[in-house]
Amino acid sequence: MDERFIAYIPTAGSNVAHAEITSPKLVKMMIKRAKKPILILGENLEDKEKELIEKFIEKYNLEVIKTPEEMNLMALIKFLANSSYDLALFVGITYYYLAQAATHLKQFSNVITVSIDKYYQPNTLYSFPNLSMEEYLDYLNKLLEG
């Protein structure tokens, strides 16, 4: 794990299936091991983030679906649940929409879901922790290293 200390305090009566907090190093390993990864790209990204995400897509030769431009998120989730993709990375999607979509994938498919947004997403299987913009850009740069 990175330098950050993040306390895990389970809430009373909560589901134990929360996202594991992950690091850029682990995300890189997941992408390299995946047979068919895909990136779901939302529109909630600032210019600095967009540049780094474009480099990230190029570096790992990821298939990309832009939502809502190319496909509605709910239709996309149904598509992913029945597809041969084994790893789905999410970035730039409105938090509460992604929460619902990731819950559906978690319950009804075998797709490994990873949120690479700057906010922790408990409904994916893996997620970056809550990050400031500076820390988030650093995480994205670490994804591009090596």
Language model segments and positions:
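Cofactor-pocket helix-loop regions in the catalytic cores of large enzyme subunits
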Residues: 1-60, 64-66
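Short His-Asn-centered micro-motif
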Residues: 41-42, 90-93, 116
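Well-ordered alpha-helical segments embedded in enzymatic catalytic cores
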Residues: 22-26, 75, 100, 139-142
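Glycine-rich, acidic loop regions that bind phosphate or pyrophosphate groups
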Residues: 1-11, 96-146
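Extended interaction regions within the primary functional domain
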Residues: 1-2, 20-21, 27-33, 70, ...
